[in-house]
Amino acid sequence: AGATGAGKTVCINTIIMSLLYQNTAEDLRFIMVDPKRVELTLYNGIPHLLTPVITNVQKTVHALKWTTGEMDRRFEMLAADGSRDIGSYNKKHPNDKIPRLVFIIDELADLMASAASEVEAGIIRLAQMARAVGIHLIVATQRPSVDIITGLMKANIPARIAFSVASIIDSRTILDCPGADKLLGRGDMLFLTADMSKPKRVQGAFISENEVNAVVDYLKSGEKVEYDDSIVEKGGNGTSSMF
């Protein structure tokens, strides 16, 4: 979380780029949510996307329900196979791997304003359980207030990054301690995980929009894109899987 211009979207882009450089669409898939319609939509057309970048609140709710259904399906597959997690399952089945799935929300505040209970429930359920089956969450917001980053949500998202924020209160909302209000902006961040006693100050990398576009254009020129429309449709809440 962080204020406008602090480096939040650049950080998301560097994470996405790093994952794209290291994983084919067979190994890793994305669901991306961008209510502002300007940050993540440039990734439309890459083969790693399960569905076009979602800009609609109701479609986001459907996608969260689909993803929790996918999580349950994966747990059933692992149980039937006797595997503890996705890593051990994929080692046993090198020719039939389950891809990891990263669900990215670039502006949580817009979703919480329209569908708070459904969005919060979906995020919490995935944050609590989904990592073992290879489903991961990246959630970002410019407004780190307690009605956006709720206590339950925060309790279930142990790895947090705070960019420059306006006040000590905002810093405490993200990290449970002050400090983010003193950051300098432009990728200056505090990073905290569950096994750290206090946040670590880190300088984020920078990637330009031109560099992102170059990678996206290259990926678009390769594999054919296959989208699953059921992910964002009502009723697509766990009845089918792409994998």
Predicted regions and their residues:
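Conserved lysine of the Walker
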Residues: 8
